[in-house]
């Protein structure tokens, strides 16, 4: 489930990915959409610097833990993913 590009995420980053992936898969019934939304959610909290995932300085300004159904829509437009990230 976790794309190769995201394998070395910190524990909390992996939890964010899994949570968004599972919720998006249930909602949209598409693994491609679920993966893209989960990647976007991770990138709201972490950035890759010199091959290591680091928390964003502004990571606490975005909440990835809301319980509303529409919480994934914020992540759809803010970050785009590349084909390498989804592989």
Swiss-Prot record:
Source species, domain of life: Viruses
Acidic residues composition-biased segments: 71-87
Region (Disordered): 52-87
Short name of any one Pfam family annotated for the protein: ChaB
Transmembrane intervals: none
InterPro entries for the chain: ChaB (IPR009317), ChaB_sf (IPR037205)
Listed name of the protein: Uncharacterized 10.1 kDa protein in LEF8-FP intergenic region
Originating species: Autographa californica nuclear polyhedrosis virus
Lineage of source species: Viruses, Viruses incertae sedis, Naldaviricetes, Lefavirales, Baculoviridae
